[in-house]
């Protein structure tokens, strides 16, 4: 091995394997694009995004870490969410939870 060398695993890597998912329609009702990061508590996203919020409590986007999803004005799309991991505590964001889920 050479220092700093990266030896990738053979085959595909499946993200969030085995986690329960929720898929729902999300629409941007605003006049500006809205971007949501991979680990943002989806329940607390911008109010310009219209969807069934209660279904998303404790959930995040099912996308690769460090990436984001952008919703253009007037755009509607299906999104898939997975549960937040760890201690299942949420602090910050829009301060709608501030504790255990």
Swiss-Prot record:
Subcellular location, record wording: Cytoplasm
Catalytic EC class: hydrolase
GO BP, sorted A to Z: urea catabolic process
Keywords carried by this UniProt record: Cytoplasm, Hydrolase
HAMAP family, A to Z: Urease_beta (MF_01954)
Subunit relationships: Heterotrimer of UreA (gamma), UreB (beta) and UreC (alpha) subunits. Three heterotrimers associate to form the active enzyme.
Matches recorded under NCBIfam families: PRK13203.1 (NF009682), urease_beta (TIGR00192)
Name by which UniProt lists this protein: Urease subunit beta
Organism expressing this protein natively: Mesorhizobium japonicum (strain LMG 29417 / CECT 9101 / MAFF 303099) (Mesorhizobium loti (strain MAFF 303099))
Name of the gene encoding the protein in the UniProt record: ureB
């Amino acid at each position: 091995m050479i220092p700093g060398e990266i030896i990738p695993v053979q085959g595909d890597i499946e993200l969030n394997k085995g986690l329960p998912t929720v898929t729902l329609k999300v629409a941007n009702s605003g006049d500006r694009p809205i971007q949501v990061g991979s680990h943002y508590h989806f329940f607390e996203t911008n109010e310009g995004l219209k969807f069934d919020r209660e279904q998303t409590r404790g959930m995040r986007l099912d996308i690769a870490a460090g990436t984001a999803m952008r919703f253009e004005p007037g755009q509607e799309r299906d999104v898939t969410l997975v549960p937040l991991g760890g201690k299942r505590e949420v602090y910050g964001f829009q301060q709608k939870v501030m504790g255990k889920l």
